[in-house]
Amino acid sequence: MAMTTRNNNNVLAISKKQLGVLAASAAVGALRNHISESSPALLQSAVGLGKKALNKVRNRRKQGNQQIITHVGGVGGSIMAPVAVSRQLVGSKPKFTGRTSGSVTVTHREYLTQVNNSSGFVVNGGIVGNLLQLNPSNGTLFSWLPAIASNFDQYSFNSVVLHYVPLCGTTEVGRVALYFDKDSQDPEPADRVELANFGVLKETAPWAEAMLRIPTDKVKRYCNDSATVDQKLIDLGQLGIATYGGAGTNAVGDVFISYSVTLYFPQPTNTLLSTRRLDLTGSLADATGPGYLVLTRTPTVLTHTFRVTGTFNLSGGLRCLTSLTLGATGAVVINDILAIDNVGTASAYFLNCTVSSLPATVTFTTTGISSATVNVVRGTRANVVNLL
């Protein structure tokens, strides 16, 4: 029996379709009234759910590499040694960009050095004297960049990242630390106490990767092309690599440096040749160009102590009384050599060698050494020095 209603005293029939529309309209109206009355509570509930989700994201970031499985003796942030760790390395193509006239931005990644393990506390392979000062002209930190930076007066680092890549097994014991010191003339840390006080520091096991991001300030500084009295005025800071707690002195990893630097104000090309001269008393008289090595002598031994890895050509001379005897210690290979002895007056030498890790030295033994001079430049094994 159909429902009826009266309109103007007339009886009208309502179909099932019309009845459904009326019911839906009534339901929508009731829902709208409920939302209007309950809107504050619904809004508060939505805000609460948002806060819970945000807190979960923050907690995950704070946990970092924390293991999902709890390991006995481990705390938050600890990692478990896997069976094997491997990293595939690919070549880095340098990128050049320029937004303003007279400047260029260089982005690249370079190999810095091999890291050897040590039982005691060792910084920068035992080489002291502010080895890794952050300046694009520093030939002991960069091998590729100085050839470009030597054509500019000023620089500004946009980003700098140190990346430690292991090459040892997960059974290797010890620690590897990367740090940054804002003062480029500060002495290297003497022990683990001083190391731990650095604000920009990353430590890891020899078998685990690590990255250290260096803070930059966009300040324009001068490229180091002369003998500067206060290095901290031209350097962004200095980097350091420390090892300790190991069971030997074997190679455990490599360190790469990635950077983006803007160079300003082109200038005549500065020298990439390193010159070191000792006077008659054995004191350093002149030091120009990159600090590839330190030249010292005793009355019987002239010593070249390398401060950076790579292949180099050395040409030098010394006042002495007898013939020269070549010697080498550490990870250095003599590729080619020519020595000219003038017994009783002076001798000269030309040398091509490859240094794969520090420390490494090349020596000449004779008698009656007084003054000496050596010029050093990066080269390749094809730069032979012997006579045909």
Curated annotation (Swiss-Prot):
MF term (GO), any: structural molecule activity
Keyword presence, Iron: no
Cellular compartment(s): Virion
Swiss-Prot/TrEMBL keywords: Capsid protein, RNA-binding, T=3 icosahedral capsid protein, Virion
Pfam family, one: Viral_coat
Residues covered by region (P domain, projecting): 265-388
Disulphide bridges: none
Major localization class: virion
Region annotation Involved in encapsidation: where it falls in the sequence: 57-63
Ranges for region S domain, virion shell: 103-264
Family matches, as Gene3D superfamilies: 2.60.120.20
Region feature R domain, interaction with RNA, mapped onto this chain: 2-102
Post-translational modification: The N-terminus is blocked.
A single GO cellular-component term on record: T=3 icosahedral viral capsid
Recorded superkingdom: Viruses
Family: Belongs to the icosahedral plant coat protein family.
Quaternary structure annotation from Swiss-Prot or TrEMBL: Homomultimer.
Function: Capsid protein self-assembles to form an icosahedral capsid with a T=3 symmetry, about 32-35 nm in diameter, and consisting of 180 capsid proteins.
Name recorded for this polypeptide: Capsid protein
Originating species: Tomato bushy stunt virus (strain BS-3)
